[in-house]
Amino acid sequence: GVNGSPPPASILQDKDRMATNQDYQISPSSWNRFEECPRKYWLSRQGLPRKASMAASSGTAIHNTVEDLCNLDISDRDEGEMGWLHSTAREALERNWKAERQEFLGTPRHPRWKSEMFSKAHDGLIGALGFLFEKAGLSKRELSEVSIQSWRQVQDIVLETEATLESDCGRMMGRLDLLLLDPSSSEGGVGWIVADLKTGRPPRSGLDEKVRRQLLFYRDLAKQRSPEQNSITAEGWYSSNETIYVAHGPSILEEAIDAWESMKVTEEPFQATPSESACSFCDWKAWCPDWWVSRSEGLLDGSRMFRDEVTELVRLDHDSGAALFERTTPTDQEGSLEGSDYRFGAILKGKALEQIKQ
């Protein structure tokens, strides 16, 4: 490339890839973090304690259950058998829900596990399976009315589940949920569908730009891996409103390479760009002096976002778990702190109490 910059992905061959030492890759999520706030991306690469969330755990349980059902061995079952999918799907979801709960509770930073969200996850699973019926050319139906033969028809269009895609140059990677045959494709031969299952809030109108870019990212990596495939469509499947959104647009791989060039982590922290959108769901606020300063100076309204406080433990009753904390405030841009007049109490239980006793 010009001025010693690496050549674009499109002209790198396998031998070049092997000779190029890559210590990081760009993914849709890391790209989004970097654009929202370079400091957020930098902190995410520092090995800080992870934070779990119910939404993420529930979504993972649904995704893993769809994968399990797509890969289910039903070769020895009678094709006319009915009434099996409802119980099988629920059992698979319960198994994955239990696994996610263990992972959740084993994460250093986590809120309360909400068992009551299982029914919502089950509804999301039913919505996700409905998309597969539609793509296989089957009418919408209750799970109890799905025969073995019908599910085989679904499995026949599934090419891959939870597939990891990597660019030829090794700098870009993505993990897609489903790669399907598209029997309805009108472009010479059977097309493919890159499908990403979304269990969160659906868009009000069109796709969010970040989601659109994520889908195009997967589409373009799939095209690069299989250049002989003429038609590859990228779709976002929103189970909450049972709606499919198609992503359109030109290739974004060159744009991704440009982003990759800027994302090489240095010892010096990247610039922070605090904002309501960047900070609301940031998992690393407690390690960001700019977050504390912005809160302290009233530049951010912390009442409408998840808050990570920097506090000092004033008192703890080891038996009851009753604790008194004092909020600390920043004194400079480097993260120096001092005490304040704001104190608050809390009752600590379970792992939180065990950890603070240490």
Predicted regions and their residues:
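Nuclease catalytic cores
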Residues: 31-75, 82, 90, 94, ...
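Mg2+/Mn2+-dependent nuclease catalytic core
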Residues: 153-256
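Short, acidic/hydrophobic/Gly-rich beta-strand patch recurrent on exposed beta strands
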Residues: 194-196, 323-330
